[in-house]
């Protein structure tokens, strides 16, 4: 079953993450603002692969279920469209979604459960449409982003805010011994109108949801990819 495979893969990745956290903690302080992190290593942001192929080639398989749903929904061309930015969810974000859906259903019927198989059976049209939430029809590398954030239209025509904010959080790479203050990309999805002078850091519900990017500035042959963190819930489900 797809659901069992997803659970097994996620558990393996959780164990891997725990084992590598200490190493990552000592490596992250050297992050440069124009780089991006994959597994704690600095890489040149230029990637000689399409967005789809880069996600599919991830050595830890953190996009396996995402890629499967993209294939089944027939939206490969959407994320490979030339000149876009894709804020990519991970398999963890899909897991968070099916868990949240299950909890909501079980308030009515404790025996009900929502799974990845349920998504394949019932939600591929929704997935095909909602993937547009994560696409901005222009390239947004880190050097074009601002601390207070800028509003853009996503591919569904809805407002999103993308910002590039400094952090003093040691868990996000800050080290008081370093002269370089790390910066983090945030992707904020808006449910309500936002004034032009409101900084992205002030966005809260019910106005919108801020989602931190865990891997930023990946510049593929077709566009830019910013990978959302593993606590995100697919479709901004709430």
Predicted regions and their residues:
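Sec-dependent bacterial lipoprotein signal peptides
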Residues: 1-31
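Mature, structured domains of secreted/extracytosolic soluble proteins
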Residues: 16, 29-238
């Amino acid at each position: 079953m797809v659901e069992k495979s997803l659970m097994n893969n996620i558990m393996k990745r959780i164990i891997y993450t725990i084992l590598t956290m200490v190493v990552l903690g000592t490596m992250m302080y050297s992050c440069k603002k124009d780089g991006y992190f994959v597994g704690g290593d600095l890489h040149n942001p230029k990637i000689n692969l399409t967005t789809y192929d880069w996600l599919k080639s991830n050595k830890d398989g953190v996009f396996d279920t995402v890629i499967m749903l993209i294939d089944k929904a027939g939206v490969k061309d959407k994320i490979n469209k030339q000149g876009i930015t894709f804020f990519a969810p991970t398999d963890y974000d899909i897991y968070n979604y099916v868990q949240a859906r299950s909890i909501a259903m079980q308030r009515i019927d404790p025996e009900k459960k929502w799974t990845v198989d349920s998504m394949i059976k019932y939600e591929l049209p929704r997935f095909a449409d909602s993937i547009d939430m994560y696409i901005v029809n222009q390239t947004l590398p880190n050097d074009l982003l601002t601390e207070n954030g800028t509003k853009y239209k996503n591919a569904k025509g809805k407002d999103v805010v993308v910002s590039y904010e400094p952090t003093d959080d040691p868990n996000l790479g800050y080290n008081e011994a370093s002269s370089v203050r790390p910066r983090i990309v945030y992707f904020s999805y808006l449910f309500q109108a936002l004034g032009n002078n409101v900084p992205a850091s002030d966005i809260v519900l019910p106005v919108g949801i801020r989602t931190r990017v865990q891997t930023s500035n990946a510049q593929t042959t077709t566009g830019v990819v910013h990978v959302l963190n593993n606590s995100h819930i697919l479709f901004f489900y709430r």
